Design a protein with these regions (language model features):
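Interfacial segments of alpha-helical transmembrane regions
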Residues: 1-2, 101-111, 169-184
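Long, glycine/tryptophan/cysteine-rich extracytoplasmic
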Residues: 28-51
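N-terminal signal-anchor transmembrane alpha helix
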Residues: 1-31, 184
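Individual transmembrane alpha-helix segments
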Residues: 46-84
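Hydrophobic cores of alpha-helical transmembrane segments in multi-pass inner/ER membrane proteins
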Residues: 82-88, 145-161
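Short aromatic-rich membrane-water interface segments that cap or initiate transmembrane helices
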Residues: 33-34, 65-77, 134-146
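Structural signal for the C-terminal ends of transmembrane alpha-helices
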Residues: 90-98, 157-166
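Interfacial helix-loop-helix junctions of multi-pass membrane proteins
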Residues: 12-22, 119-140
């Protein structure tokens, strides 16, 4: 569900032209948004130094900036949350030796795909922080396609875990699982 939410928020970020509002990429320290007027003005001044503000959004107010900043911030925070929701159980199950070799390979690939998405996202944003303040459509397509591939591969890994022979006899559990999968 988080991957789906991430893709939807990414789409909203694109449609609201919010993706270039956060001009710095701090993997760990960037988790805290501006919390007071001074910090908001600092973030806005950083944005003002880039061509998107100078050439397109030069009439943008601090209030409007906060709106576009929100969508990009939310997109990045869901990415961080997704990473934590994945990595913590992954490490736990590795330590407890609860994953077979096939699942270790599959989940390691998922981990790499998730990390790659973050890198591709920043690569895409960097393409718009130049003289031509618009992200590369090619990089955007790569970002979206790899998101879909990650989503599909996640299902490919998870479905055999959900629909095992042991669980197929429990019709209530199977029905609930199908409903849950539809909700995702």
């Amino acid at each position: 569900a988080l991957i789906f939410i991430m893709v939807v928020i990414g789409g909203i970020t694109r449609l609201t032209d919010s993706g270039l509002s956060m001009v710095k990429w701090n993997l760990f320290m960037g988790a805290i948004p501006p919390l007071n007027e001074t910090e908001w003005k600092e973030a806005f001044n950083l944005y003002k130094a880039y061509p998107e503000y100078q050439k397109i959004n030069f009439n943008c107010t601090l209030s409007e900036f906060k709106y576009i900043y929100f969508w990009e911030y939310l997109h990045r925070m869901i990415g961080r949350l997704l990473g934590l929701v994945f990595i913590i159980p992954f490490i736990y199950f590795l330590i407890k030796k609860r994953l077979n070799k096939k699942l270790i390979v599959q989940t390691s690939i998922l981990l790499l795909m998730g990390a790659m998405q973050g890198a591709i996202g920043w690569w895409m944003v960097k393409s718009g922080l130049v003289n031509n303040p618009d992200v590369s459509h090619y990089r955007l397509a790569v970002h979206l396609i790899t998101a879909f591939l990650t989503f599909a591969f996640t299902f490919w890994v998870v479905l055999p875990l959900i629909f095992t022979k042991e669980r197929s006899g429990n019709t209530v559990l199977l029905g609930l699982t199908k409903i849950l999968m539809l909700l995702i």
